[in-house]
């Protein structure tokens, strides 16, 4: 029994320490002008407004918001319309990916980019999601360096240590799943 407890403790500590360094301290890519900004689904934590703000500043002329939310979602109703930016109009598209996953969002963006001849996109998500999103977009959007620019929603995460442990375990599992799935067809 003591061996089992020791193994569990080691796994939990290892998950927390490695997760802290890989996920909690994930870095943004330097912002570059892009064809579009894609907002990955998740919680309404300011990511929609942050992304539209980037577009208004001229970083892209189109914002694609992944919309896995139910009809009548008040945030989506507020943000799902074109706006005016410093460089002219900003197109806002709210689309439901065929699969409500990061992989589904990357595949949706690959199709949209091909249809619209886009070469570069900015991807917005949680800071701790960036490593996994970066891998999945390399697998399913483009493996070419510099084609996807990863940006975290600028916010502070007020999680308890136990909540962080769950976040890290979830991200590690998602990373393992993405590696196992490999490239999108």
What is each PLM-predicted segment?
Residues 1-17:
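Hydrophobic membrane-insertion alpha-helices, especially the h-region
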Residues 17-165:
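A structural signal for short, hydrophobic/glycine-enriched beta-strand patches
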Residues 161-185:
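A transmembrane-helix-recognition feature enriched in membrane-embedded lipid enzymes
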């Amino acid at each position: 029994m003591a061996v089992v407890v020791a193994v569990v403790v080691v796994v939990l500590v290892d998950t927390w320490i490695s997760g802290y360094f890989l996920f909690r301290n994930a870095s943004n890519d330097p912002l570059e002008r892009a064809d579009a900004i894609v907002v990955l689904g998740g919680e309404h934590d300011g990511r929609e407004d942050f992304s539209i703000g980037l577009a208004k500043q001229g970083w892209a002329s189109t914002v694609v918001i992944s919309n896995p939310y139910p009809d009548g979602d008040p945030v989506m109703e507020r943000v799902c319309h074109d706006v005016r930016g410093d460089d002219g109009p900003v197109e806002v598209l709210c689309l439901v990916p065929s699969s409500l996953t990061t992989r589904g969002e990357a595949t949706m963006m690959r199709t949209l980019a091909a249809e619209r001849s886009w070469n570069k996109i900015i991807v917005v998500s949680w800071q701790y999601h960036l490593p996994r999103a970066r891998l999945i977009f390399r697998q399913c959007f483009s493996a070419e360096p510099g084609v996807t620019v990863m940006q975290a929603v600028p916010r502070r995460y007020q999680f308890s240590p136990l909540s962080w442990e769950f976040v890290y375990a979830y991200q590690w599992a998602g990373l393992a799943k993405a590696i196992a799935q490999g490239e999108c067809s």
